[in-house]
């Protein structure tokens, strides 16, 4: 995960469970203030244990240049984990979804955001990642959901959304598409 040189940032925890615990605490506040018939749409990708990630020095991303390489080499190795090994896919999305479910959220759906134009990855020992999870969570078993407003042209929308990342004139490879929050907001609100 990217490091922004802020002691209070999320994502630099030693273990994924610590990250999930912090996010769970934050999202329980969302649960507290959400209307009883409201929906909470959570987009989260996964990470590999021991990955040293990128760095942001306050002005520039130095993920892939020579400085970024030096930075990654200087970062401390993660502390030993009870079962995750270096290069293991951590499983953060499902850890978080199940943690929220245990705390009282209704886990209604796991939507796959398929990215037809995924960010390039410099890996040779696995396939490149091209999807993220979007979890639909609610406070109550009955909630507002307008399936018609997000329907596809000829059918009800499925749980795999093929949506390109957005384009950007600047050097940013993973711009979040506005279509995803638009669909979530439209499906979950009456206005």
Question: Where are the regions that the model predicts?
Answer:
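Core catalytic lobe of class I
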Residues: 1-191
């Amino acid at each position: 995960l990217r490091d922004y040189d802020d002691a209070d940032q999320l994502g630099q925890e030693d273990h994924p469970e610590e990250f999930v615990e912090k996010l769970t605490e934050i999202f329980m506040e969302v649960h507290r203030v959400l209307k009883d018939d409201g929906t909470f749409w959570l987009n989260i990708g996964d990470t590999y244990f021991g990955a040293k990630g990128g760095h942001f020095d306050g002005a520039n991303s130095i993920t892939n240049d020579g400085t970024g390489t030096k930075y990654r080499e200087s970062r401390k190795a993660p502390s030993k984990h009870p079962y995750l090994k270096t290069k293991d896919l951590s499983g953060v999305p499902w850890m978080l979804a199940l943690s929220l479910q245990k705390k009282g959220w209704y886990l209604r759906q796991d939507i796959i955001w398929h990215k037809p134009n995924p960010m390039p990855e410099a890996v040779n020992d696995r396939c490149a990642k091209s999807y993220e999870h979007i979890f639909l969570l609610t406070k109550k078993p009955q909630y507002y959901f307008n399936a018609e407003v997000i329907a596809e042209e000829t059918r009800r929308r499925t749980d795999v959304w093929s949506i390109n990342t957005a384009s950007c004139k600047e050097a940013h490879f993973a711009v979040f598409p506005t279509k995803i929050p638009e669909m979530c907001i439209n499906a979950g609100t009456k206005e």
